[in-house]
Amino acid sequence: ESGRMAVIDIGSSSVRLVIYDDVQGYPFLILNQKIWAAFAENKGEGEFNLEQTKIDRVMAALEWFIWTARQTQCSHMVVFATSAVREAQNGKDFVQQAERKIGGRIHILSGEAEAHLATTGAMASIPDAKGVVIDLGGGSLELSDTSQKHFTSLPLGVLSLKALSGDDPVKAKAILVKEIQKIDWLKDLPGNSIVAIGSGMRSIARLHMAAFDYPLEITHDYNLPPETGIEFCQKLINGEDMGVRVQNISKAYKDVLPYRAAALCALLELENIDNVRFATFGIREGVLFSQMASCPVSRDPLKAFALELAHRQGR
Protein backbone atom coordinates (compact mmCIF):
# COMPACT_ATOMS: atom_id res chain seq x y z
CA GLU A 1 0.00 0.00 0.00
CA SER A 2 1.38 3.38 -0.99
CA GLY A 3 1.30 6.49 1.14
CA ARG A 4 2.23 7.01 4.76
CA MET A 5 1.96 4.32 7.38
CA ALA A 6 1.95 4.64 11.17
CA VAL A 7 3.10 1.90 13.55
CA ILE A 8 2.33 2.19 17.27
CA ASP A 9 4.30 -0.15 19.52
CA ILE A 10 2.91 -0.61 23.07
CA GLY A 11 6.00 -2.12 24.60
CA SER A 12 6.92 -3.23 28.09
CA SER A 13 9.20 -0.22 28.59
CA SER A 14 7.80 2.45 26.31
CA VAL A 15 5.08 3.34 23.84
CA ARG A 16 6.38 4.48 20.48
CA LEU A 17 4.92 5.97 17.30
CA VAL A 18 6.83 5.72 14.04
CA ILE A 19 5.57 7.08 10.74
CA TYR A 20 7.02 5.99 7.41
CA ASP A 21 6.57 7.69 4.07
CA ASP A 22 5.77 5.85 0.84
CA VAL A 23 5.70 2.26 2.04
CA GLN A 24 5.18 1.00 -1.52
CA GLY A 25 8.93 1.12 -2.04
CA TYR A 26 11.60 1.17 0.66
CA PRO A 27 10.28 2.92 3.81
CA PHE A 28 11.48 6.40 4.69
CA LEU A 29 11.17 7.31 8.39
CA ILE A 30 9.67 10.76 8.91
CA LEU A 31 8.61 10.68 12.59
CA ASN A 32 9.67 8.76 15.70
CA GLN A 33 8.13 9.62 19.08
CA LYS A 34 8.40 7.75 22.38
CA ILE A 35 6.75 7.90 25.80
CA TRP A 36 8.31 5.98 28.71
CA ALA A 37 5.73 3.67 30.32
CA ALA A 38 7.64 0.95 32.25
CA PHE A 39 4.67 -1.45 32.08
CA ALA A 40 6.90 -4.37 33.13
CA GLU A 41 8.53 -2.60 36.06
CA ASN A 42 6.86 -4.82 38.67
CA LYS A 43 6.98 -7.96 36.54
CA GLY A 44 8.92 -10.63 38.40
CA GLU A 45 7.90 -14.20 39.09
CA GLY A 46 4.21 -15.01 39.27
CA GLU A 47 1.20 -12.89 38.37
CA PHE A 48 1.31 -9.14 37.89
CA ASN A 49 -0.97 -6.29 36.86
CA LEU A 50 -0.45 -3.16 34.80
CA GLU A 51 -0.49 -0.23 37.23
CA GLN A 52 -3.30 2.29 36.79
CA THR A 53 -0.99 5.32 36.75
CA LYS A 54 0.95 3.76 33.87
CA ILE A 55 -2.25 2.79 32.07
CA ASP A 56 -3.38 6.42 32.27
CA ARG A 57 -0.03 7.55 30.87
CA VAL A 58 -0.25 5.10 27.98
CA MET A 59 -3.84 6.13 27.22
CA ALA A 60 -2.76 9.77 27.00
CA ALA A 61 0.11 8.77 24.72
CA LEU A 62 -2.20 6.76 22.45
CA GLU A 63 -4.58 9.71 22.14
CA TRP A 64 -1.67 11.96 21.16
CA PHE A 65 -0.24 9.41 18.72
CA ILE A 66 -3.57 8.83 16.97
CA TRP A 67 -4.03 12.59 16.56
CA THR A 68 -0.49 12.89 15.18
CA ALA A 69 -1.04 10.05 12.69
CA ARG A 70 -4.21 11.69 11.43
CA GLN A 71 -2.58 15.10 11.14
CA THR A 72 0.24 13.60 9.07
CA GLN A 73 -2.35 11.96 6.80
CA CYS A 74 -1.34 8.34 7.30
CA SER A 75 -3.27 6.03 5.00
CA HIS A 76 -2.68 2.95 7.13
CA MET A 77 -1.96 2.28 10.80
CA VAL A 78 -1.00 -0.81 12.82
CA VAL A 79 -1.06 -0.89 16.64
CA PHE A 80 0.50 -3.80 18.52
CA ALA A 81 1.40 -4.73 22.08
CA THR A 82 4.05 -7.09 23.42
CA SER A 83 4.90 -9.17 26.50
CA ALA A 84 3.79 -6.93 29.38
CA VAL A 85 0.27 -6.51 28.01
CA ARG A 86 0.18 -10.13 26.87
CA GLU A 87 1.11 -11.52 30.29
CA ALA A 88 -0.57 -9.07 32.68
CA GLN A 89 -3.66 -10.23 34.59
CA ASN A 90 -5.49 -7.08 33.49
CA GLY A 91 -3.98 -7.07 30.00
CA LYS A 92 -7.27 -7.89 28.25
CA ASP A 93 -9.09 -5.13 30.14
CA PHE A 94 -6.37 -2.68 29.12
CA VAL A 95 -6.64 -3.72 25.46
CA GLN A 96 -10.41 -3.27 25.44
CA GLN A 97 -10.05 0.19 26.97
CA ALA A 98 -7.26 1.13 24.57
CA GLU A 99 -9.18 -0.10 21.52
CA ARG A 100 -12.10 2.12 22.49
CA LYS A 101 -9.66 5.02 22.84
CA ILE A 102 -8.10 4.60 19.39
CA GLY A 103 -11.21 3.33 17.61
CA GLY A 104 -9.40 0.35 16.15
CA ARG A 105 -7.79 -3.01 16.80
CA ILE A 106 -4.66 -3.69 18.87
CA HIS A 107 -2.71 -6.79 17.88
CA ILE A 108 -1.32 -8.75 20.84
CA LEU A 109 1.85 -10.41 19.60
CA SER A 110 2.89 -13.82 20.86
CA GLY A 111 6.50 -14.34 21.87
CA GLU A 112 7.14 -16.23 18.63
CA ALA A 113 5.53 -13.47 16.56
CA GLU A 114 7.72 -10.89 18.32
CA ALA A 115 10.84 -12.89 17.46
CA HIS A 116 9.74 -13.43 13.85
CA LEU A 117 8.92 -9.77 13.21
CA ALA A 118 12.10 -8.57 14.93
CA THR A 119 14.16 -10.88 12.74
CA THR A 120 12.33 -9.77 9.60
CA GLY A 121 13.21 -6.17 10.41
CA ALA A 122 16.81 -6.96 11.32
CA MET A 123 17.41 -8.96 8.15
CA ALA A 124 16.02 -6.15 6.02
CA SER A 125 18.78 -3.87 7.30
CA ILE A 126 21.66 -6.41 7.43
CA PRO A 127 20.67 -9.03 4.82
CA ASP A 128 24.06 -10.78 4.87
CA ALA A 129 23.96 -11.46 8.64
CA LYS A 130 23.99 -15.10 9.76
CA GLY A 131 23.59 -16.19 13.35
CA VAL A 132 21.14 -15.15 16.07
CA VAL A 133 18.95 -12.04 16.37
CA ILE A 134 18.46 -10.67 19.90
CA ASP A 135 15.59 -8.34 20.78
CA LEU A 136 15.66 -7.36 24.46
CA GLY A 137 12.59 -5.45 25.59
CA GLY A 138 11.32 -4.42 28.97
CA GLY A 139 9.43 -7.63 29.69
CA SER A 140 10.94 -10.30 27.47
CA LEU A 141 13.96 -11.47 25.50
CA GLU A 142 13.32 -12.73 21.98
CA LEU A 143 15.89 -14.88 20.19
CA SER A 144 15.72 -16.14 16.63
CA ASP A 145 18.18 -17.66 14.21
CA THR A 146 18.59 -15.56 11.06
CA SER A 147 17.11 -18.31 8.88
CA GLN A 148 13.95 -18.05 11.03
CA LYS A 149 13.78 -21.79 11.69
CA HIS A 150 13.99 -21.42 15.47
CA PHE A 151 12.45 -18.91 17.88
CA THR A 152 12.64 -18.61 21.65
CA SER A 153 10.95 -16.06 23.90
CA LEU A 154 12.10 -15.73 27.51
CA PRO A 155 10.26 -13.62 30.16
CA LEU A 156 13.54 -11.87 30.91
CA GLY A 157 13.37 -8.27 29.72
CA VAL A 158 15.39 -5.53 31.36
CA LEU A 159 12.63 -4.53 33.79
CA SER A 160 11.70 -8.09 34.71
CA LEU A 161 15.41 -8.94 35.12
CA LYS A 162 15.78 -5.99 37.44
CA ALA A 163 12.90 -7.28 39.58
CA LEU A 164 13.96 -10.94 39.51
CA SER A 165 17.58 -10.18 40.42
CA GLY A 166 16.76 -7.78 43.24
CA ASP A 167 18.32 -4.92 41.26
CA ASP A 168 21.60 -6.81 40.85
CA PRO A 169 22.98 -6.89 37.25
CA VAL A 170 25.58 -9.55 38.17
CA LYS A 171 22.81 -11.87 39.38
CA ALA A 172 20.75 -10.95 36.30
CA LYS A 173 23.57 -12.17 34.06
CA ALA A 174 23.72 -15.46 35.96
CA ILE A 175 19.95 -15.89 35.42
CA LEU A 176 20.38 -15.23 31.70
CA VAL A 177 23.33 -17.60 31.31
CA LYS A 178 21.36 -20.41 32.98
CA GLU A 179 18.34 -19.92 30.70
CA ILE A 180 20.35 -19.44 27.50
CA GLN A 181 22.23 -22.70 28.12
CA LYS A 182 18.88 -24.52 27.90
CA ILE A 183 18.31 -23.40 24.28
CA ASP A 184 19.68 -26.27 22.17
CA TRP A 185 19.36 -24.59 18.77
CA LEU A 186 21.86 -21.90 19.80
CA LYS A 187 24.57 -24.58 19.49
CA ASP A 188 23.88 -25.03 15.77
CA LEU A 189 23.42 -21.55 14.29
CA PRO A 190 23.50 -20.75 10.54
CA GLY A 191 26.37 -18.33 11.24
CA ASN A 192 28.47 -16.83 13.99
CA SER A 193 27.05 -13.32 14.50
CA ILE A 194 24.76 -11.82 17.10
CA VAL A 195 22.47 -9.25 15.48
CA ALA A 196 21.40 -6.87 18.26
CA ILE A 197 18.38 -4.67 17.60
CA GLY A 198 16.61 -1.89 19.46
CA SER A 199 17.69 1.55 20.65
CA GLY A 200 18.67 0.14 24.05
CA MET A 201 21.24 -2.20 22.50
CA ARG A 202 22.46 0.56 20.21
CA SER A 203 23.11 2.63 23.36
CA ILE A 204 25.83 0.10 24.22
CA ALA A 205 27.32 0.58 20.76
CA ARG A 206 27.21 4.36 21.12
CA LEU A 207 28.97 4.24 24.48
CA HIS A 208 31.68 2.00 23.06
CA MET A 209 32.13 4.30 20.05
CA ALA A 210 32.49 7.30 22.36
CA ALA A 211 34.89 5.51 24.71
CA PHE A 212 37.22 4.61 21.85
CA ASP A 213 36.82 7.82 19.77
CA TYR A 214 35.19 6.07 16.83
CA PRO A 215 35.13 8.72 14.06
CA LEU A 216 31.57 8.12 12.80
CA GLU A 217 28.28 8.54 14.67
CA ILE A 218 26.66 5.63 12.85
CA THR A 219 25.68 2.64 14.95
CA HIS A 220 24.17 0.61 12.11
CA ASP A 221 26.31 -2.49 11.53
CA TYR A 222 28.86 -1.37 14.11
CA ASN A 223 30.42 -4.63 15.26
CA LEU A 224 32.54 -5.92 18.11
CA PRO A 225 34.44 -9.20 18.56
CA PRO A 226 33.48 -11.31 21.61
CA GLU A 227 36.47 -10.47 23.79
CA THR A 228 36.01 -6.71 23.26
CA GLY A 229 32.25 -6.86 23.74
CA ILE A 230 32.47 -9.01 26.87
CA GLU A 231 35.08 -6.75 28.48
CA PHE A 232 33.03 -3.62 27.78
CA CYS A 233 29.71 -5.17 28.85
CA GLN A 234 31.29 -6.44 32.06
CA LYS A 235 32.27 -2.87 32.94
CA LEU A 236 28.67 -1.75 32.40
CA ILE A 237 27.39 -4.66 34.51
CA ASN A 238 29.74 -3.67 37.32
CA GLY A 239 28.63 -0.03 37.12
CA GLU A 240 32.03 1.33 36.13
CA ASP A 241 32.18 4.91 34.89
CA MET A 242 33.12 4.82 31.20
CA GLY A 243 34.40 8.37 31.42
CA VAL A 244 32.31 9.42 28.41
CA ARG A 245 29.04 11.26 27.94
CA VAL A 246 26.75 10.40 25.06
CA GLN A 247 23.87 12.67 24.05
CA ASN A 248 20.29 11.46 23.73
CA ILE A 249 20.55 8.44 26.02
CA SER A 250 17.70 8.99 28.47
CA LYS A 251 17.97 8.41 32.21
CA ALA A 252 15.46 5.59 31.90
CA TYR A 253 17.73 3.85 29.39
CA LYS A 254 20.82 4.45 31.52
CA ASP A 255 19.13 2.89 34.55
CA VAL A 256 18.64 -0.43 32.75
CA LEU A 257 21.81 -0.37 30.65
CA PRO A 258 23.62 -2.88 32.94
CA TYR A 259 20.82 -5.40 32.27
CA ARG A 260 21.13 -4.94 28.51
CA ALA A 261 24.87 -5.45 28.89
CA ALA A 262 24.20 -8.61 30.92
CA ALA A 263 22.09 -10.11 28.12
CA LEU A 264 24.60 -9.22 25.42
CA CYS A 265 27.49 -10.52 27.52
CA ALA A 266 25.73 -13.83 28.17
CA LEU A 267 25.30 -14.40 24.43
CA LEU A 268 28.81 -13.24 23.52
CA GLU A 269 30.16 -15.93 25.84
CA LEU A 270 28.69 -18.67 23.63
CA GLU A 271 31.49 -20.71 22.03
CA ASN A 272 30.31 -20.31 18.43
CA ILE A 273 30.01 -16.49 18.35
CA ASP A 274 32.49 -14.37 16.36
CA ASN A 275 30.98 -10.89 16.74
CA VAL A 276 27.95 -8.74 17.53
CA ARG A 277 26.47 -6.48 14.84
CA PHE A 278 24.09 -3.67 15.82
CA ALA A 279 21.14 -3.19 13.44
CA THR A 280 18.95 -0.14 12.86
CA PHE A 281 15.76 -1.99 11.92
CA GLY A 282 13.80 -4.14 14.33
CA ILE A 283 10.30 -5.23 15.26
CA ARG A 284 8.50 -2.09 14.08
CA GLU A 285 10.08 -2.37 10.64
CA GLY A 286 9.20 -6.07 10.69
CA VAL A 287 5.57 -5.11 11.30
CA LEU A 288 5.81 -2.58 8.48
CA PHE A 289 7.24 -5.11 6.02
CA SER A 290 4.57 -7.64 6.98
CA GLN A 291 1.99 -5.17 5.66
CA MET A 292 3.77 -4.65 2.33
CA ALA A 293 2.99 -6.57 -0.84
CA SER A 294 6.70 -7.02 -1.56
CA CYS A 295 8.98 -7.28 1.47
CA PRO A 296 12.49 -5.95 0.72
CA VAL A 297 14.28 -8.34 3.10
CA SER A 298 16.20 -10.01 0.28
CA ARG A 299 17.30 -6.68 -1.24
CA ASP A 300 20.39 -4.71 -0.38
CA PRO A 301 19.06 -1.92 1.88
CA LEU A 302 21.42 0.78 0.57
CA LYS A 303 20.65 0.02 -3.08
CA ALA A 304 16.92 -0.29 -2.41
CA PHE A 305 16.80 3.04 -0.56
CA ALA A 306 18.93 4.79 -3.22
CA LEU A 307 16.65 3.50 -5.98
CA GLU A 308 13.53 4.60 -4.09
CA LEU A 309 15.06 8.05 -3.49
CA ALA A 310 15.95 8.37 -7.18
CA HIS A 311 12.40 7.51 -8.22
CA ARG A 312 10.98 9.99 -5.73
CA GLN A 313 13.35 12.93 -6.23
CA GLY A 314 14.61 12.42 -9.80
CA ARG A 315 13.60 14.97 -12.43
Model regions and ranges:
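Short glycine-aspartate micro-motif
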Residues: 5-9, 131-135, 194
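Acidic, divalent-metal-coordinating active-site segment for phosphoryl/phosphodiester hydrolysis
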Residues: 138-145
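N-terminal basic/disordered segments at the start of proteins
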Residues: 3-29
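Conserved ATP-binding subdomain of kinase catalytic cores across diverse folds
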Residues: 24-41, 70, 76
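Conserved catalytic motifs of the protein kinase core domain
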Residues: 3, 32, 129
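Helical "lid/coupling" subdomains associated with nucleotide-phosphate turnover
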Residues: 19-22, 42-67, 71-74, 85-124, ...
